[in-house]
């Protein structure tokens, strides 16, 4: 119905229809420059002004029959110019008031509501520059009564709109684009709507009447404005990014009317359209205009358009009639769009359509969100804004679509390629023979998730979802490098991949003596191991003799006894020296006892040998004890011989005991080595303890008269007194009769020293 154009009348209908669709969002450039929290309306003052206006209008309406009263009410009305508000009723309905009053209301709304514009001139001066129809003629009392006055006032209003612009000298003083704001003047074009269409429209209004006002719909009512607050920055935080262009405040956005036309065709009873006025971009603000003045402009009532949203260029007669009523209702109740609308390609005209309106049945299906140009922003800021707009679109548009309710706010943090990369890593971790070791936390998380799903299922019989991972059979491959006889080292992977001339192996020729000596060493070791194994087989036969003897009949036991003697003799002969019958070969003894298994063999063999042969073996051990102790530092197996050797010592005669002590002392310097070994010290104490037992038990013992024994005991006593306590090894046990033995051969002072040293060794044991 109402169509406005700027002074530049070159915006054609095709250009208007070709405008790009954009969302009803705030202008990002304006918010980045001034911030979104700068609007601070004084609602108490507005509330007071609205209350005064309501009281004065009520005083005017009851006296409609009196022309003076009506005229006074009109003047009172014109003296107070409140800002438009969606919550209060500024103007009466068109059924209750005249058409002239409607025009006056429009003029007051545009020129008088804003404090910034009202400060330019007084109300009386404003009215002096207005056309005579709006300033000099108050409504007649009869205009408030019938439909004829309604049509007459409407016709006067149309004539005012089609009359053409006033001189620039008259408009300039109160132009909303001039003075301190620095905008170019805006005029109303008179050639938009013809008189023929107006006459047809008036005839339809006479016949049909004005339709009821539809309830105003706005999608901005339930919106939380806190989510529209971007960071209050005027430029991008990234150094080197393009600067933000200074675009004038108040330049409305461009928006086509395709969605509004669809809603008009689908719902003709509730049409809410706005007059779309294409306009050239006004010049920028002068440098003297501060941000505070810009904020006052943004807070002014002029920031909300008083006209309905986008008018269809070609409307039917019924739609025009409905539009007349919807305009008045929009003035009183409908909230106006925001002043600044952001979009691609700059700012849009002030009276342009601010965005598609949501109809009573929700947004049109298939409408894709339009993204703003945020290439000048920081990447992190751009991501935050895109997520905010997406979440806001889901919140508003998802009321009618159920599939958008459960949108993940973190869905845009990773790209699809990154998600696939993480999924592949998880699948590689799951291909494991021991998942609890390789991916412990994921296995526990999955078990907890399954238990939670089972609890939420309320004991319903459903198949639990199991993670099916591909079973990849792991082929155990053991790399065996190729070896060549005489080559240096092993072949490497680089040698296989990059073949080269092999290094010439230098063949070192050894002498025959070295080869013979090496063969002898290997043969000797093989011979020792063979001898030990053969002796073990004989020892097992000897150990099983008692079982076989009890199970064998009496007439066969003699044969079994002969076999037992033969096996025992073979065991001793493997240790005996060839030239001597009662002497163990030192070399053979050392060879066998140099092996750990050989030492265990001797400890198991001693109880089965006859007493003379066992004594010979013990003497051979005592004779070669320093060498055996040196080889037994790691094995520590000689201590296993203490028990069988003590049994053999207790069965010896005094002469054999003296010979054993002499073999243990050996040559000069052997006794200190014996005292440093645990088995050697224990063996010495056993020999001395057995001699003391013989002397104390038998007064006629030959040891008292044997000078060798006495000299050996003196030698041992001197060595014990001389050796330091740290060098004396602790024995396995200390016989208690050693003190009485030493008391026979030393004085009391030395006896106390020996006793103290023996106690120390006993405590250290």
UniProtKB/Swiss-Prot annotation:
Subcellular location field: Cytoplasm, P-body; Nucleus; Nucleus, PML body; Nucleus speckle
Positions of the UniProt region annotated as Disordered: 1-98, 119-147, 210-244
Basic and acidic residues bias (residue ranges): 45-59, 218-227
Biological processes annotated in GO: deadenylation-dependent decapping of nuclear-transcribed mRNA; P-body assembly
Keywords carried by this UniProt record: Cytoplasm, Nucleus, Phosphoprotein, RNA-binding
Biased composition regions of type Low complexity, renumbered to the chain: 235-244
Full protein name: Protein PAT1 homolog 1
Organism (species): Danio rerio (Zebrafish)
């Amino acid at each position: 119905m109402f169509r406005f154009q700027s002074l530049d009348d070159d915006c054609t209908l095709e250009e208007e229809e070709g405008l790009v669709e954009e969302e009803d969002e705030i202008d990002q450039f304006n918010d980045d420059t001034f911030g979104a929290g700068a609007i601070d309306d004084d609602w108490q003052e507005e509330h007071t002004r609205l209350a005064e206006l309501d009281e004065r209008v009520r005083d005017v309406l009851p006296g409609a029959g009196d022309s003076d009263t009506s005229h006074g009410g009109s003047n009172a009305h014109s003296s107070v110019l409140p800002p438009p508000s969606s919550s209060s009723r500024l103007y009466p309905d068109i059924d209750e008031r005249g058409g002239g009053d409607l025009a006056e209301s429009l003029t007051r709304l545009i020129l008088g509501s804003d404090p910034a514009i009202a400060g330019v001139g007084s109300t009386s001066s404003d009215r002096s520059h207005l056309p005579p129809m709006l300033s000099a003629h108050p409504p007649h009392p009869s205009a408030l009564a019938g439909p004829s006055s309604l049509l007459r006032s409407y016709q006067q209003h149309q004539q005012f709109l089609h009359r053409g612009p006033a001189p620039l000298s008259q408009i300039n003083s109160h132009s909303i684009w001039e003075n301190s704001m620095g905008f170019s003047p805006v005029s109303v074009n008179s050639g938009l709507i013809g008189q023929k269409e107006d006459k047809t429209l008036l005839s339809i209004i006479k016949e049909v009447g004005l339709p009821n006002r539809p309830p105003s719909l706005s999608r901005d009512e339930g919106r939380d404005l806190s989510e529209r607050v971007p960071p209050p920055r005027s430029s991008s935080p990234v150094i080197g990014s393009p600067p933000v262009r200074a675009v004038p405040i108040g330049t409305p956005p461009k928006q086509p009317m395709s969605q509004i036309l669809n809603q008009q065709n689908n719902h003709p009873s509730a049409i809410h359209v706005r007059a779309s006025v294409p306009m050239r971009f006004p010049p920028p603000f002068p440098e003297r205009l501060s941000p505070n003045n810009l904020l006052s402009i943004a807070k002014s009532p002029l920031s909300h358009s008083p006209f309905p949203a986008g008018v269809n260029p070609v409307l039917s007669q019924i739609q025009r009639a409905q539009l007349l009523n919807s305009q008045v209702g929009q003035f009183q109740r409908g909230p106006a769009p925001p002043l600044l609308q952001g979009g691609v390609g700059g700012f849009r005209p002030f009276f342009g359509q601010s965005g598609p309106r949501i109809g009573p049945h929700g947004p049109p299906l298939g409408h894709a969100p339009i993204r703003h140009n945020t290439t000048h922003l920081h990447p992190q800021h751009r991501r935050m804004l895109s997520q905010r707009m997406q979440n806001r679109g889901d919140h508003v548009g998802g009321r009618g679509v159920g599939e958008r309710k459960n949108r993940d706010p973190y869905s845009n943090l990773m790209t699809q390629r990154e998600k696939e990369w993480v999924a592949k890593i998880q699948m590689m971790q799951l291909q494991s023979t021991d998942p609890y070791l390789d991916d412990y936390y994921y296995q526990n998380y999955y078990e907890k998730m399954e238990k939670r799903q089972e609890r939420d299922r309320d004991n319903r019989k459903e198949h639990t979802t199991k993670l099916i991972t591909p079973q990849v059979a792991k082929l155990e491959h053991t790399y065996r490098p190729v070896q060549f006889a005489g080559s240096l080292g092993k072949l490497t992977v680089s040698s296989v991949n990059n073949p080269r001339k092999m290094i010439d192996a230098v063949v070192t020729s050894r002498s025959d003596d070295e080869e013979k000596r090496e063969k002898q060493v290997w043969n000797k070791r093989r011979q020792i191991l063979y001898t030990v194994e053969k002796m073990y087989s004989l020892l097992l036969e000897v150990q099983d003799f008692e079982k076989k003897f009890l199970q064998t009949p009496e007439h066969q036991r003699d044969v079994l006894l002969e076999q037992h003697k033969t096996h025992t003799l073979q065991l001793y002969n493997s240790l005996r020296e060839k030239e001597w019958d009662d002497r163990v070969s030192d070399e053979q003894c050392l060879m066998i006892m140099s092996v750990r298994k050989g030492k265990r063999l001797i400890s198991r063999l001693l109880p089965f040998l006859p007493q003379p042969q066992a004594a010979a073996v013990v003497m051979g051990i005592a004779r070669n004890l320093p060498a055996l102790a040196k080889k037994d530092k790691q094995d520590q197996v000689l201590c296993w011989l203490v028990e069988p050797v003590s049994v053999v010592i207790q069965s010896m005669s005094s002469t054999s005991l003296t010979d054993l002590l002499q073999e243990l002392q050996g040559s000069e310097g052997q006794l200190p080595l014996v005292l440093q070994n645990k088995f050697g010290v224990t063996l010495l104490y056993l020999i001395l303890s057995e001699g003391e037992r013989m002397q104390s038990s038998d007064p006629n013992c030959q040891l008292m008269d044997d000078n060798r024994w006495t000299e050996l005991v003196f030698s041992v006593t001197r060595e014990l007194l001389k050796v330091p306590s740290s060098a004396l090894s602790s024995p396995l046990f200390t016989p208690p009769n050693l003190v009485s033995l030493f008391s026979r051969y030393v004085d009391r002072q030395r006896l106390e020293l020996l006793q103290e040293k023996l106690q120390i060794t006993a405590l250290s044991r």
